[in-house]
Regions:
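N-terminal subdomain of nucleotide-sugar transferases
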Residues: 1-55
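Conserved nucleotide-sugar phosphate-binding/catalytic loop shared by glycosyltransferases and other
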Residues: 17-23, 47-97, 174-179
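Active-site-proximal region of nucleotide-activated glycan assembly enzymes
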Residues: 52, 60, 130-191
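An aromatic- and histidine-rich active-site surface loop
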Residues: 59-63, 113-132
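Glycine-rich, highly charged phosphate/nucleotide-binding loops
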Residues: 90-105, 192
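Short N-terminal targeting/anchoring amphipathic segment
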Residues: 102-121, 137-139
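Conserved donor-binding/catalytic core segment of Leloir-type glycosyltransferases
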Residues: 200-205
Length: 205
Protein backbone atom coordinates (compact mmCIF):
# COMPACT_ATOMS: atom_id res chain seq x y z
CA UNK A 1 0.00 0.00 0.00
CA UNK A 2 2.43 2.68 -0.92
CA UNK A 3 5.80 4.15 -1.49
CA UNK A 4 8.12 6.12 0.74
CA UNK A 5 10.76 8.72 0.07
CA UNK A 6 13.43 10.26 2.31
CA UNK A 7 16.61 12.25 2.00
CA UNK A 8 19.75 10.09 1.86
CA UNK A 9 20.92 11.14 5.32
CA UNK A 10 17.49 10.43 6.79
CA UNK A 11 17.32 6.99 5.17
CA UNK A 12 19.97 5.86 7.66
CA UNK A 13 17.78 6.71 10.66
CA UNK A 14 15.60 4.09 12.33
CA UNK A 15 11.99 4.18 11.16
CA UNK A 16 10.06 6.90 12.99
CA UNK A 17 6.38 7.22 13.63
CA UNK A 18 4.84 10.17 11.80
CA UNK A 19 4.03 13.23 13.85
CA UNK A 20 1.73 14.63 11.18
CA UNK A 21 -0.36 13.06 8.43
CA UNK A 22 -1.21 15.17 5.39
CA UNK A 23 -4.08 13.50 3.55
CA UNK A 24 -5.39 14.27 0.10
CA UNK A 25 -4.35 14.56 -3.49
CA UNK A 26 -5.58 13.07 -6.70
CA UNK A 27 -4.89 16.46 -8.29
CA UNK A 28 -2.03 18.93 -7.98
CA UNK A 29 -4.51 21.50 -6.66
CA UNK A 30 -5.04 19.36 -3.56
CA UNK A 31 -1.44 18.22 -3.25
CA UNK A 32 0.72 21.35 -3.70
CA UNK A 33 -0.63 23.20 -0.61
CA UNK A 34 0.19 20.09 1.44
CA UNK A 35 3.76 20.09 0.17
CA UNK A 36 4.10 23.75 1.15
CA UNK A 37 2.84 22.95 4.66
CA UNK A 38 5.21 19.98 4.88
CA UNK A 39 8.18 22.13 3.87
CA UNK A 40 7.24 24.66 6.55
CA UNK A 41 7.11 21.91 9.18
CA UNK A 42 10.63 20.89 8.15
CA UNK A 43 11.76 24.53 8.34
CA UNK A 44 10.44 24.60 11.91
CA UNK A 45 12.52 21.60 12.93
CA UNK A 46 10.48 18.50 12.11
CA UNK A 47 12.21 15.74 10.17
CA UNK A 48 10.85 14.82 6.77
CA UNK A 49 10.42 11.23 7.91
CA UNK A 50 7.84 12.34 10.50
CA UNK A 51 5.56 14.07 7.96
CA UNK A 52 3.55 11.33 6.25
CA UNK A 53 1.43 11.92 3.15
CA UNK A 54 -1.57 9.72 2.41
CA UNK A 55 -2.91 9.98 -1.12
CA UNK A 56 -4.40 8.21 -4.11
CA UNK A 57 -2.67 5.57 -6.19
CA UNK A 58 -3.71 7.38 -9.36
CA UNK A 59 -2.68 10.85 -8.25
CA UNK A 60 0.48 12.94 -8.78
CA UNK A 61 1.46 12.33 -5.15
CA UNK A 62 2.80 8.90 -6.16
CA UNK A 63 5.79 10.63 -7.76
CA UNK A 64 5.83 14.22 -6.47
CA UNK A 65 5.91 13.40 -2.75
CA UNK A 66 8.89 11.00 -2.84
CA UNK A 67 10.73 13.49 -5.08
CA UNK A 68 10.41 16.03 -2.25
CA UNK A 69 11.79 13.53 0.27
CA UNK A 70 8.61 12.78 2.24
CA UNK A 71 7.11 9.33 2.91
CA UNK A 72 3.77 8.58 1.27
CA UNK A 73 1.16 5.85 1.55
CA UNK A 74 -1.16 5.37 -1.41
CA UNK A 75 -4.77 4.23 -1.08
CA UNK A 76 -6.70 2.32 -3.76
CA UNK A 77 -9.80 3.71 -5.41
CA UNK A 78 -11.01 6.95 -6.95
CA UNK A 79 -13.43 9.77 -6.28
CA UNK A 80 -17.21 9.34 -6.43
CA UNK A 81 -19.19 11.48 -8.87
CA UNK A 82 -22.66 12.83 -8.18
CA UNK A 83 -24.55 10.52 -10.57
CA UNK A 84 -25.54 6.93 -9.78
CA UNK A 85 -23.61 4.72 -12.21
CA UNK A 86 -21.89 1.34 -12.20
CA UNK A 87 -18.56 3.15 -12.02
CA UNK A 88 -19.73 5.00 -8.92
CA UNK A 89 -20.75 1.75 -7.25
CA UNK A 90 -17.26 0.40 -7.90
CA UNK A 91 -15.79 3.67 -6.63
CA UNK A 92 -17.87 3.33 -3.45
CA UNK A 93 -16.35 -0.10 -2.82
CA UNK A 94 -12.90 1.37 -3.44
CA UNK A 95 -13.58 4.13 -0.94
CA UNK A 96 -14.63 1.55 1.66
CA UNK A 97 -11.36 -0.34 1.11
CA UNK A 98 -9.39 2.91 1.35
CA UNK A 99 -11.16 3.83 4.58
CA UNK A 100 -10.26 0.47 6.09
CA UNK A 101 -6.61 0.90 5.15
CA UNK A 102 -6.57 4.47 6.47
CA UNK A 103 -8.09 3.34 9.77
CA UNK A 104 -5.46 0.64 10.23
CA UNK A 105 -2.69 3.08 9.33
CA UNK A 106 -3.78 5.80 11.76
CA UNK A 107 -4.48 3.30 14.53
CA UNK A 108 -0.95 1.97 14.15
CA UNK A 109 0.88 5.30 13.76
CA UNK A 110 -1.19 7.56 16.06
CA UNK A 111 -0.03 10.92 14.64
CA UNK A 112 -0.51 14.13 16.61
CA UNK A 113 -2.78 15.58 13.92
CA UNK A 114 -4.23 14.96 10.46
CA UNK A 115 -4.47 17.68 7.80
CA UNK A 116 -7.15 16.94 5.17
CA UNK A 117 -6.76 18.75 1.84
CA UNK A 118 -9.57 17.30 -0.27
CA UNK A 119 -10.02 14.30 -2.51
CA UNK A 120 -11.19 10.79 -1.64
CA UNK A 121 -8.00 9.89 0.27
CA UNK A 122 -8.63 12.79 2.62
CA UNK A 123 -12.18 11.56 3.26
CA UNK A 124 -10.85 8.13 4.25
CA UNK A 125 -8.24 9.62 6.59
CA UNK A 126 -10.52 12.28 8.05
CA UNK A 127 -13.21 9.75 8.94
CA UNK A 128 -10.58 7.51 10.51
CA UNK A 129 -9.10 10.40 12.50
CA UNK A 130 -12.57 11.22 13.83
CA UNK A 131 -13.16 7.61 14.90
CA UNK A 132 -9.79 7.47 16.68
CA UNK A 133 -10.03 10.89 18.33
CA UNK A 134 -7.04 12.31 16.44
CA UNK A 135 -7.18 16.11 15.95
CA UNK A 136 -8.29 16.92 12.40
CA UNK A 137 -7.74 20.13 10.45
CA UNK A 138 -9.50 20.58 7.10
CA UNK A 139 -7.83 23.00 4.67
CA UNK A 140 -9.80 24.27 1.68
CA UNK A 141 -8.19 26.29 -1.10
CA UNK A 142 -11.37 27.56 -2.79
CA UNK A 143 -13.96 30.29 -2.36
CA UNK A 144 -16.59 27.51 -2.43
CA UNK A 145 -15.50 24.53 -0.34
CA UNK A 146 -15.10 21.25 -2.19
CA UNK A 147 -17.54 18.40 -1.63
CA UNK A 148 -15.00 16.17 0.14
CA UNK A 149 -14.07 18.92 2.58
CA UNK A 150 -17.71 19.81 3.25
CA UNK A 151 -18.38 16.16 4.02
CA UNK A 152 -15.64 15.78 6.64
CA UNK A 153 -15.55 19.32 8.05
CA UNK A 154 -18.18 18.43 10.66
CA UNK A 155 -15.56 16.20 12.33
CA UNK A 156 -12.77 18.80 12.21
CA UNK A 157 -11.16 20.46 15.19
CA UNK A 158 -10.82 23.51 12.94
CA UNK A 159 -11.00 24.43 9.25
CA UNK A 160 -8.42 26.56 7.45
CA UNK A 161 -10.15 28.77 4.88
CA UNK A 162 -8.47 30.53 1.97
CA UNK A 163 -11.25 33.13 1.60
CA UNK A 164 -13.69 34.95 3.84
CA UNK A 165 -17.19 33.56 4.00
CA UNK A 166 -16.34 29.93 3.20
CA UNK A 167 -19.18 27.81 4.57
CA UNK A 168 -17.19 25.49 6.84
CA UNK A 169 -17.65 25.04 10.60
CA UNK A 170 -15.01 26.42 12.97
CA UNK A 171 -13.33 28.15 10.03
CA UNK A 172 -10.21 30.26 10.51
CA UNK A 173 -9.14 32.58 7.68
CA UNK A 174 -5.57 31.53 6.87
CA UNK A 175 -5.22 32.10 3.13
CA UNK A 176 -3.61 29.53 0.87
CA UNK A 177 -0.17 28.05 1.62
CA UNK A 178 2.26 29.65 -0.85
CA UNK A 179 5.81 28.59 -1.73
CA UNK A 180 8.51 30.97 -0.40
CA UNK A 181 9.88 31.58 -3.89
CA UNK A 182 6.49 32.89 -5.02
CA UNK A 183 6.32 35.24 -2.03
CA UNK A 184 9.83 36.44 -2.83
CA UNK A 185 8.92 37.02 -6.48
CA UNK A 186 5.89 39.07 -5.47
CA UNK A 187 8.15 41.54 -3.66
CA UNK A 188 10.29 42.30 -6.73
CA UNK A 189 10.11 45.71 -8.33
CA UNK A 190 9.04 45.98 -11.98
CA UNK A 191 12.66 46.52 -13.02
CA UNK A 192 13.82 43.47 -11.04
CA UNK A 193 11.03 41.32 -12.47
CA UNK A 194 11.88 42.38 -16.02
CA UNK A 195 15.55 41.59 -15.41
CA UNK A 196 14.69 38.15 -13.98
CA UNK A 197 12.56 37.37 -17.02
CA UNK A 198 15.05 38.79 -19.50
CA UNK A 199 12.60 41.42 -20.75
CA UNK A 200 13.72 44.81 -22.13
CA UNK A 201 13.19 47.64 -19.65
CA UNK A 202 11.84 50.03 -22.30
CA UNK A 203 9.15 47.87 -23.93
CA UNK A 204 5.50 47.35 -23.09
CA UNK A 205 4.60 43.80 -22.13
Amino acid sequence: MGVSGTDDHEAKRPAERPTFVIAGGGTAGHLIPGLVVADELVRRGHRRSTVLFVGAERGPEATLVPERGFPVRLLPGRGIQRSLTAENLAAGWGLARAAGQALRLLRRERPQAVLALGGFASVACAASAALLGIPLVVADQNALAGSANRLVARFATSCAAAFEGVDLPRAVLTGNPVRPEIIAAASLSKAEARARLGLPADRTV
